[in-house]
Every structure is written in C-alpha cells, then in structure tokens.
Amino acid sequence: MRYGFTTGSCAAAAAKAAAYMLLTGKIKNCITIETPKGIPYTAEVTDIVRGESQVSCAVVKDGGDDPDVTSGSKICATVTADNRGDGEKELLQIDGGKGVGRVTRPGLDQPVGNAAINHVPREMITREVQEVCRICDFHGTLHILISVPDGEALAERTFNPRLGIVGGISILGTTGIVEPMSSQALKETIRVELRQQRAEGQTIAAVSPGNYGLDFMQQTYGYDLDRSVKCSNFIGETIDMAAELGFCAMLLTGHIGKLIKVAGGIMNTHCLLYTSD
C-alpha cells in the first residue's frame, strides 16, 4: 500500500516553494520537505504566479492508496515579502485564505477566529520557510496565505460543518503522512469532537457507534445530534477519551448487537475482531 501526504505537508511544500521563488527569483518546479514522521516529501509545484513582492504556487494533494475528499485538490500558498523587521531574524505570519475554514467554536486545535490550520502544519510551514530565509539571508517579514480553491465545496463532505469550522477545509496532519486504511484518523476525529463538547460545558458524553443510535436519540428523545459523537467500533477508546477529558458520565446508544458485545467486555465491536465459540 502506498502512503499519501497530508494537507499540512502540501501547504508546507507550497509555502517553501513560493518563498524560495520570491527570495531567489528562480523558478522551482519541484520541492522537497521533511515530514514530522521523517519521510521526505518531494512535490511537483504548479500554478506559479510571480510578482515583484509576491509569489503564489500550488501542490496537488496525493492521498496515496487511502484517498480522502481532498485528494487531487490544489493546496496553494501565496508568500508576500515585507522588509520590515528587526534586521536579525525573519518574521513569518501564517493565515488562511479562500477555501480554508475558520474556527467558530472552542475546543479545537486553534482558537476561535483563527484559520483552521492546525499547529503541526503551522510548525512545518514555519520550519521549511525559515530554512529558505536562512539560505537567502532574509531578515524581513513574510506573509504566508494558504488557500484551497475548491475547499468550501469539499468542506461539506467533511466533519467541519459539525465542528463549527466554516468556509472551507482544515489544513491537518500530525505526521505529514496519510497511512493507508488508517483507523487512527477516525480515532482522532472522535477525540476532537469529545474535546469540543467538553470545552462547551458538557459533562455527559452522548455517544453512539453509528447512525442507528443517533437516529434513535433524535427521534425518540429529540436529542440534538450536534451534541453527540459517533464512535464507530472504537467504544473502548472512546470511553477512555471521555474519562481523560473529564466527562462524568456517558450515554451510549446503539444497536442491541453492539451493546451486547460491550456488556461482555468487548470494547472494539468490529465483526472481524470477535467470533463466538
């Protein structure tokens, strides 16, 4: 199975390429960055537009053998130079443009009002652009704007509307790598939703393995689905997360077949992981 690369890796690569072309005046058709996982990523650079104090370019997201909705989309970076600075160290300002979401609810990686560019991608962008600044002996200010032309439409197919991220997708990734058929991504989504519910003051986690339980909560009790979390088969991990985040109780609603497994101490309810004798 072939690895892919996250939107964070693509944003860092595009920002590095744009900064390089701006500060050197040379065209860069491919660029290499180091991902947090230690795997180098070499990306083709497209859509190059050069100006006197600004360069923009794009990198096409490659999701590998486990593509998500962002695979094939262009992750763009526009870097603008501003010579103001202390003359000793470069200053980098990172923001999101068209197609990158804005955070409107607490409990996420970024504070309310910020572009939904998570902290690891921000660190990656900073590290890669700082490398270019050192090579070019640049000590001014660079404004880095990350955008995704089709990001607003793509976001409707993600968890972002549910999480209160409006206007586009998030720039994500903790390792820089998209692992094929990774269950870790789903578990991280569960953690994000639980953390957000806790930040908004909830003390009881309303959880369901799937749509059956969510529909039951809504139709029978009129429960607000924005206050519930779908945990798939990862019930044990979800209970642990809720405890770590300080919830005092959990309401677990689902199909009787799933709940019988939990009653028997089976905390991952995937059908391939348990068979009766």
Give residue spans per PLM region.
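Generic N-terminal targeting/processing segments that precede catalytic cores or assembly contacts
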Residues: 1-157, 161-163
